[in-house]
C-alpha cells in the first residue's frame, strides 16, 4: 500500500510555507511509510508522478484560508474545494489537481492549515509552525482522518448555499 503526502505552498510567503516546511521535516526525519512530494506553488506539475504511484491514499497539505483562527487545522472535502472561496497562491486551483488524479488514487484527503500572514518575505507565524508540527507528529500513526476535524459551517464563518456545499462567498468583500 502506497501513501503519498503532497505538501503544497510557497516558503517565501510566510504562512503559505506550511506545506514546504512539512516536506522538509519529513525529508529530515521520515514519518511512517509516506512518499513525500514537495509540490511547492505548482503542485499540478506532480500529477504524473502521483498517477504513476497509484497511491491508496493521497494527503494534500496546504495553508488554506478557511476563516478560522491562525494555526487551526481542518479536513476539507475535496469535492468542496472548487465551490469554496479560498485564497490561494498556486498557479492552478487544487480542485483541478484532484480532478486529474482522482481515478488513480484510492482516497484523497485535503488538510488545510489556517494561515495568519501570507506575504512575500514574511516569516512563518508561530501558530502555523505549531500546526505543521501537529500534522508531522500524526503522520506515522495516521488512521482514517488522522484525528482532524472536518471543516463544517458550525466550525467556520462559511455559509451553506446551493447544493449544500460550503462556500466563502460572504467573505469575498472582507479581503
Describe the role of every protein-language-model region:
Residues 1-115, 122-146, 168-175:
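N-terminal catalytic or cofactor-binding beta/alpha core of small enzyme domains
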Amino acid at each position: 500500500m502506497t501513501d503519498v503526502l503532497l505538501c503544497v505552498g510557497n516558503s517565501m510567503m510566510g504562512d503559505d510555507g506550511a506545506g514546504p516546511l512539512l516536506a522538509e521535516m519529513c525529508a529530515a526525519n521520515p514519518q511512517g511509510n509516506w512518499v513525500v512530494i514537495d509540490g511547492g506553488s505548482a503542485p499540478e506539475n506532480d500529477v504524473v508522478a502521483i498517477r504513476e504511484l497509484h497511491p491508496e491514499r493521497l494527503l494534500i497539505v496546504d495553508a488554506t484560508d478557511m476563516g478560522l483562527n491562525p494555526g487551526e487545522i481542518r479536513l476539507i472535502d475535496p469535492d468542496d474545494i472548487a465551490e469554496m472561496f479560498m485564497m490561494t497562491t498556486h498557479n492552478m486551483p487544487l480542485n483541478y489537481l484532484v480532478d486529474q488524479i482522482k481515478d488513480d488514487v484510492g482516497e484523497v484527503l485535503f488538510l488545510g492549515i489556517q494561515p495568519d500572514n501570507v506575504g512575500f518575505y514574511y516569516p512563518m507565524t508561530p501558530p502555523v509552525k505549531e500546526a505543521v508540527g501537529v500534522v508531522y507528529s500524526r503522520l506515522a500513526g495516521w488512521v482514517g482522518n488522522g484525528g482532524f476535524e472536518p471543516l463544517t459551517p458550525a466550525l467556520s464563518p462559511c455559509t451553506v448555499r446551493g447544493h449544500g456545499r460550503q462556500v466563502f462567498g460572504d467573505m469575498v468583500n472582507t479581503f
